[in-house]
A protein has these predicted regions:
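Signature of long, low-cysteine stretches enriched in small and polar/charged residues
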Residues: 100-148
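Bacterial signal peptide processing site
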Residues: 23-25
Length: 196
């Protein structure tokens, strides 16, 4: 009987170890494609890329070779994620590209807040000498932390669309865009919890 009890205990222990191993593999897969890059950014406080896969799943198309990554926003170096909307032949296609850094030569540029929507700031970008360089929506996903960082999405309208024609609510309420934002935000929150 003792022999059978020992075997039973060993069998149960082996099963528990197996379950733990499976669980850890599943946890590793959660957020796969995002988490490695986000963790790197959080620890090093530097620019990082996020997988383009979520954008592909939502039907986003890669316009050129330099539009294959997303960039996290950082207040210190004024970088942001860009989702750029182009209009061609009456058909719109959305691409993702790295943020532009205006640099010192563009110090005359300013962002004018044109409203708040769903807890996010909405900006319109103006160029020097009152000429409109671009129109954008910047949606802030998280509050600035003790690291002085804020995650945001910058929607940049640079061709075929005037600022006055921009319907912010319609764009922000679009199903694909909201799904993209919620997926991205959950990933950031998961990563922040792990690094605490």
């Amino acid at each position: 009987m003792k022999k059978y009890r020992k075997l039973s205990v060993l069998l149960i222990v082996a099963m528990l170890v197996g379950l733990c191993a499976c669980g850890s593999k599943d946890d590793g897969k959660k957020g796969d494609g995002y988490k490695k890059e986000v963790d790197t950014y959080t620890k090093e406080k530097d620019e990082a890329s996020i997988s383009f896969e979520i954008a592909k799943e939502l039907g986003y198309k890669e316009k050129t070779s330099d539009t294959s990554s997303l960039t996290l926003a950082n207040q210190e170096n004024d970088t942001s994620i860009d989702i750029v909307l182009f209009h061609e032949n009456s058909k719109s296609s959305t691409v993702v590209r790295e943020a532009e850094d205006y640099g010192e030569d563009h110090s005359g540029f300013e962002h004018i807040t044109i409203g708040d929507y769903k807890g996010s700031k909405v900006f319109r970008s103006w160029g020097k000498e009152d000429s409109i360089r671009e129109c954008e929506i910047r949606l802030v996903l998280t509050e600035p932390s003790d690291k002085n960082m804020v995650y945001a999405v910058k929607v940049n309208f640079t061709k075929g669309l005037e600022c006055e024609d921009l319907d912010v609510k319609e764009f922000v309420d679009s199903e694909d865009f909201m799904h993209f934002l919620s997926s991205f935000k959950v990933t950031l929150e998961d990563s922040e919890e792990e690094t605490k």
